[in-house]
Amino acid sequence: MPALDLIRPSVTAMRVIASVNADFARELKLPPHIRSLGLISADSDDVTYIAADEATKQAMVEVVYGRSLYAGAAHGPSPTAGEVLIMLGGPNPAEVRAGLDAMIAHIENGAAFQWANDAQDTAFLAHVVSRTGSYLSSTAGITLGDPMAYLVAPPLEATYGIDAALKSADVQLATYVPPPSETNYSAAFLTGSQAACKAACNAFTDAVLEIARNPIQRA
């Protein structure tokens, strides 16, 4: 795989809880209208978060839980654990299944990490969410429907790339995830027009590729 090839993620496990146990629902702090849960794991956390946001736009569901697992998919407790667990909550199993279907479609065909080099040892994500759903807009603290540049890379690459992205276009920093995260990456959510978010993604990509080509730049 040469640099910039997509790294397609996979769903590792999925189940529907048609009617959540009342005690469990209280423990999860579910609102009364959430009666069913969709559980899904995949081997790419950030792609799965974007897919979960897509589900909120296509079905009557909410993301009631979403967390990355420590140290990434390669170090999970089982092959089915993947890198992240998402719980979609909905009023009934049909809506939850519709949300899971939307997630699967996006995980298999939507946003994806890319290799920054031919050695395939450095991956990054620079993706424009053209219209945020309830999950990402709430996470980033932006207005529902606003575009977002979703940027992820290893710590130094992300730090350098986020600065380059912010300087490249009329975008604002909505959320910054400093290193180390659960998977030892760093990330940022930038907001602005779709065109500005695309320009920011391009600048971020260029910065990450520059470091991949020449990691140590002497003053």
Curated annotation (Swiss-Prot):
It is found in: Bacterial microcompartment. One of its GO terms (molecular function) is zinc ion binding. SMART domains: BMC. Gene3D superfamilies: 3.30.70.1710. Residues 1-113, 114-215 form the BMC circularly permuted domain. Residues 45-46 are annotated as: Part of the acidic patch lining the small pore. Ethanolamine 2 binds at residue 46. Ethanolamine 1 binds at residues 45, 83, 113, 183-185. The keyword Transmembrane does not apply. This is Bacterial microcompartment shell protein EutL. It comes from Escherichia coli (strain K12). The gene is eutL.
